[in-house]
């Protein structure tokens, strides 16, 4: 299997077809360990879909994972996961900065995401990076026992100049998530 640690997997740097099943299992296992108390985990089948679809860009190393869906001028953060023992160390923040720089390099203008109103840690992270609230989806997330949590919709405007401050961290970020 191709070593997928410390890698950005995209259409230019995707593993060969023979490795997809093994890599999708690795990604699904990692995601499940990060979301142990949630039904919001992605299966091997879902990860395989993300790997095979050129509209999805996957950032992965041994301690973090992010999947984004990219369209003509927008992107959506599908999931962001950091290993529980590695949280509150700036890893999620650095991962988001890497994603934003990548999106700027391919002329994406906005990054959107949905986050549960109950996920205070993630909300703090997104606020720190510079996301702003732009909407609310009522009852978006299932919470088990038929409870539903609302989702806050957030956006980050990727405009040359706004992301300029991130570029000072570019070398450090590229070491974490090389773009191949």
Show the residue positions of the predicted features.
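Conserved GNAT acetyl-CoA-binding A-motif
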Residues: 103-114
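Acetyl-CoA-dependent GNAT
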Residues: 9-14, 21-87, 93-98, 102, ...
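Short glycine/proline-centered loop/turn elements that form peptide/ligand docking sites
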Residues: 92, 96, 119-122, 139-145
């Amino acid at each position: 299997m191709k070593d997928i640690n410390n890698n950005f997997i995209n259409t230019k740097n995707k593993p060969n077809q023979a490795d997809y099943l093994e890599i999708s299992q690795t990604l699904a296992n990692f995601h499940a360990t990060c979301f142990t108390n949630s039904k919001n985990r992605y299966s091997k089948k879902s990860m395989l879909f993300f790997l095979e679809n050129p509209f999805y860009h996957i950032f992965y190393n041994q301690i973090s994972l992010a999947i984004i869906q990219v369209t003509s001028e927008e992107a959506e953060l599908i999931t962001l996961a950091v290993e529980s023992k590695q949280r509150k160390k700036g890893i999620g923040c650095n991962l988001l900065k890497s994603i934003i720089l990548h999106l700027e390099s391919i002329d994406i203008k906005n990054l959107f995401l949905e986050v549960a109103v109950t996920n205070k840690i993630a909300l703090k992270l997104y606020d720190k990076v510079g996301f702003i609230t732009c909407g609310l989806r009522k009852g978006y997330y299932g919470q088990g026992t038929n409870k539903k949590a609302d989702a806050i919709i957030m956006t980050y405007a990727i405009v040359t100049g706004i992301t300029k401050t991130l570029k000072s961290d570019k070398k450090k970020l590229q070491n974490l998530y090389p773009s191949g």
